[in-house]
């Protein structure tokens, strides 16, 4: 079998950041998949499942209600490796295009108070698996350490050596 593109990224050198993972043509429109990498793979602990699940609920809710970008949002969801999230958006976009949006999103999560949207038995398949305090902590860490100090190394995948 062919190696899928995401397995060809050098995870040893990959930093936290926002990366274009792929672009696909769907029904005549480009869909851009972003790698929202919150943890350096294999070099720092992965996100806790409860924190990542809560980030998923809060970020998806925020993005789908965003006054400018909501009509471009296709999907937000966690990576199986627990090092970040995938964001699928309509349009032929670059990482730089969504830095401000990601700053707003992670600021929203970091500052969130109250009941997590969709975290009830009738709304969620694993409603007990939430950790708002850690979601806020991880989001603030990512915002202040990465999103507020973006460089090309946080926007473009490492090149092959």
Curated annotation (Swiss-Prot):
<keyword id="KW-0071">Autoinducer synthesis</keyword>
<keyword id="KW-0456">Lyase</keyword>
<keyword id="KW-0408">Iron</keyword>
<dbReference type="InterPro" id="IPR003815">
    <property type="entry name" value="S-ribosylhomocysteinase"/>
</dbReference>
<comment type="function">
    <text>Involved in the synthesis of autoinducer 2 (AI-2) which is secreted by bacteria and is used to communicate both the cell density and the metabolic potential of the environment. The regulation of gene expression in response to changes in cell density is called quorum sensing. Catalyzes the transformation of S-ribosylhomocysteine (RHC) to homocysteine (HC) and 4,5-dihydroxy-2,3-pentadione (DPD).</text>
</comment>
<comment type="subunit">
    <text>Homodimer.</text>
</comment>
<comment type="similarity">
    <text>Belongs to the LuxS family.</text>
</comment>
<dbReference type="InterPro" id="IPR037005">
    <property type="entry name" value="LuxS_sf"/>
</dbReference>
<dbReference type="GO" id="GO:0005506">
    <property type="term" value="F:iron ion binding"/>
</dbReference>
<dbReference type="GO" id="GO:0043768">
    <property type="term" value="F:S-ribosylhomocysteine lyase activity"/>
</dbReference>
<protein>
    <recommendedName>
        <fullName>S-ribosylhomocysteine lyase</fullName>
        <ecNumber>4.4.1.21</ecNumber>
    </recommendedName>
</protein>
<feature type="binding site">
    <location>
        <position position="57"/>
    </location>
    <ligand>
        <name>Fe cation</name>
    </ligand>
</feature>
<feature type="binding site">
    <location>
        <position position="124"/>
    </location>
    <ligand>
        <name>Fe cation</name>
    </ligand>
</feature>
<dbReference type="GO" id="GO:0009372">
    <property type="term" value="P:quorum sensing"/>
</dbReference>
<keyword id="KW-0479">Metal-binding</keyword>
<keyword id="KW-0673">Quorum sensing</keyword>
<feature type="binding site">
    <location>
        <position position="53"/>
    </location>
    <ligand>
        <name>Fe cation</name>
    </ligand>
</feature>
<dbReference type="InterPro" id="IPR011249">
    <property type="entry name" value="Metalloenz_LuxS/M16"/>
</dbReference>
<dbReference type="Pfam" id="PF02664">
    <property type="entry name" value="LuxS"/>
</dbReference>
């Amino acid at each position: 079998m062919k190696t899928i593109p995401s397995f060809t990224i050098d995870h040893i050198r990959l930093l936290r950041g926002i990366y274009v993972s792929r672009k696909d043509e769907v029904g005549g429109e480009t869909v851009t998949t972003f790698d929202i990498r919150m943890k350096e793979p294999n070099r720092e602990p992965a996100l806790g499942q409860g924190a990542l699940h809560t980030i998923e609920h809060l970020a998806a809710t925020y993005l789908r209600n965003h006054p400018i970008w909501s009509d471009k949002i296709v999907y937000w969801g966690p990576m199986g490796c627990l090092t970040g999230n995938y964001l699928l958006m309509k349009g032929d976009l670059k990482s730089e295009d969504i830095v401000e949006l990601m700053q707003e999103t992670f600021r929203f999560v970091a500052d969130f108070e109250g009941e997590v949207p969709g975290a009830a038995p009738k709304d969620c398949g694993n409603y007990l698996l939430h950790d708002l305090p850690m979601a806020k902590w991880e989001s603030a860490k990512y915002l202040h350490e990465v999103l507020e100090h973006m460089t090309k190394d946080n926007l473009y995948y490492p090149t092959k050596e």
